[in-house]
């Protein structure tokens, strides 16, 4: 029994170290937040203005409006900000990460976690997976869009590696693991509400499938492809 516990600890220890490292790197990068400083994000300010009518109606009337006149000549509110409703399990799943900062550190930390899962499933060592995950999430584009306030895009980008990891698992005939990762990653990404990134993720998935199909069929492994 003791040997099994020691083996489990030995297996989990690199991943625990990875999570702690991601947390340290993220909070070090966003350390000005700990001093009470706030990042000026244009799109967030613009969102607050466009959603004010919906927010005022909800807090004054206690009801959710499905329409707002604050954008263009009026448009559905679900693309801006809908209040009320019961949280689902995805909200609880994201809560610890969003506690780091929904519009700042949260998506960066999430991106590191998702990319780490992808690189580990690709067969890289934990050390290499950590480096790859940090490089993915701290890429200059992610920082630029956060500075501009493109928060929903940052969250959607953070979940791409999880979806890719799921498809790669499916290609390796790991049906249960692949289905869970694709389903969870896609649900979280759609919840982020940035359909442009979801569309690009779909294109990436198609390219991955074609690449896999060509590789398998070139080896005449038809049974594996059909399975």
What are these regions (language model features)?
Residues 22, 112-121, 127-215, 227:
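Membrane-embedded helix bundles of polyisoprenyl
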Residues 1-4, 8-13, 42-46, 50, ...:
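Transmembrane signal-anchor hairpin modules in multi-pass inner-membrane enzymes, especially those
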Residues 13-17, 95-103, 124-132, 178:
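Membrane-interface starts of transmembrane alpha-helices
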Residues 30, 34-38, 173, 194, ...:
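Transmembrane helix-loop junctions in multipass membrane proteins, especially transporters and channels
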Residues 5, 9, 93, 210-213, ...:
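Short helical patches
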Residues 25-115, 134-158:
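Membrane-interface coil-to-helix junctions
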Residues 1-29, 223-227:
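Start-transfer (signal-anchor) and selected internal transmembrane alpha helices
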Residues 87-89, 165, 218-221:
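Juxtamembrane/interface motifs at transmembrane-helix termini
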